[in-house]
Regions:
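A local structural motif
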Residues: 33-36, 68-81, 96-98, 168-180, ...
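Conserved C-terminal helix/tail region of periplasmic/extracytoplasmic solute-binding proteins
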Residues: 310-341
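Pocket-lining segment of extracytoplasmic ligand-binding domains
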Residues: 105, 179, 185-276
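Immediate post-signal peptide segment of exported/extracytoplasmic ligand-binding proteins
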Residues: 27-49, 69-74, 137-149, 317, ...
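Short helix-initiation/N-cap motifs at beta->coil->alpha
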Residues: 78-90, 103, 176-191
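Secondary-structure end/capping motifs
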Residues: 45-50, 240-321
Length: 341
């Protein structure tokens, strides 16, 4: 019986060990078989070319990721979505993308709704937003806007920005007739006077330049309330399976960040983004006139950035934009995030 028991035990250990080895093989194979990196970006362009602004346009124009992974035969696929954050979250849920450059609310909604994403890098901070109104409307403050028709792109960073701006003035969305329009539709509706106002980014300055809108309020006027943070997030499955690839991607991104955070490159940056996005250069020049690129585009997930991002999570929860609040520090990918660069 002893011999039989020992033999059975030996076979059991051998079978278990073999199962462990075989079970690990798919994981090892997967880790070694990265053929393509799929990156999602909200498309901010008004023309036929794609633009994500910020670090994305620098990365693509210089083919930084493509060059970084060329020696491994890994292709980089950029996917631009006009539907912005909500559509990108769907792509994450369907396993169609590995990374995404997103504004704060879209990334927060995805995480809160159960998407397994990891926070890898800051990509912008303190980005201004504007209130655009019909010329001659007499609207000078957010208080003046009560009861009016305001276009906001729901599910995007602009919605959270709007809510934060309102909260700073003791207001909420309930005080207005909020209409969900994407950025292009909102600009068209405001120009046609089909709405009273729109909350959005520098694209509203194009209407101002044409005399089709006034911009009485910006987040700068509100002491920064409503300014936007942007991030790079990665699929949890990809990050866990390919930490070396993620590490290499973040280090390659720093090449773009180092160029972008040099204030002397502001004119070149304006020219780059304007060309890709089909915006008149004066729009971005006006938007960035009093701004320092060195303050907008650092990639570190420092305590100040994480604190503001946590504030965004808390506000989104208070405004019932998300169901489950969470700790931003638990979202950060350990040992890989830009905090360690």
């Amino acid at each position: 019986m002893k011999t039989l028991f020992k033999g059975s035990l030996a076979r059991l250990f051998a079978t278990t060990a073999l199962a462990g080895v075989l079970g690990a093989l798919p994981l090892l194979a997967t880790a070694a078989e990265v053929k393509e990196i799929r990156i999602a970006v909200p498309d901010l362009s008004a023309g036929t070319e794609h633009s994500g602004g910020g670090v994305v346009d620098v990365l693509r124009s210089r083919q930084i990721f493509e060059k970084a992974f060329a020696d491994q035969g890994i292709k980089v696929q950029w996917n631009f979505f006009k539907g912005a954050g909500p559509v990108i979250n769907e792509a994450f849920a369907n396993g169609q993308v590995d990374f995404a450059y997103l504004g704060d609310l879209a990334a927060i909604i995805g995480k809160s709704n159960g998407l397994d994403t990891r926070l890898l890098s800051a990509t912008a901070r303190g980005v201004k937003q504007y209130l655009g109104v019909v010329p001659g409307s007499g609207i000078k403050t957010l208080q003046d806007l009560k009861g009016k028709r305001v276009a906001v792109f729901r599910g995007t960073a602009s919605q959270l920005s709007f809510d934060a701006a309102l909260a700073s003035q003791g207001l909420s969305e309930k005080d207005f007739k909020v209409i969900n329009l994407d950025f292009s539709a909102a600009v068209a509706a405001l120009a046609a006077k089909q709405i009273d106002a729109s909350w959005g980014s520098s694209n509203l300055t194009a209407l101002q330049a044409k005399g089709l809108a006034e911009l009485p309020v910006s987040t700068r006027d509100l002491g920064g309330a409503g300014s936007i943070q942007s991030v790079l997030v990665g699929s949890g499955a990809f990050v866990d399976a390919h930490p070396d690839v993620v590490d290499k991607l973040l280090k390659a991104q720093q090449q773009a960040v180092e160029w972008l955070t040099q204030d002397g490159n502001k004119d070149a940056y304006v020219q780059l983004v304007s060309g890709l996005a089909s915006y008149p250069q004066v729009i971005l020049q006006q938007d960035l006139k009093d701004e320092k690129l060195s303050e907008i585009f650092p990639s570190q997930l420092d305590p100040v950035f994480l604190g503001k991002l946590q504030g965004s999570v808390d506000l989104a929860s208070q405004q019932k934009l998300i169901r489950k609040p969470f700790k931003v520090t638990d979202w950060v990918a350990p040992n890989l995030a830009a905090a360690g660069l």
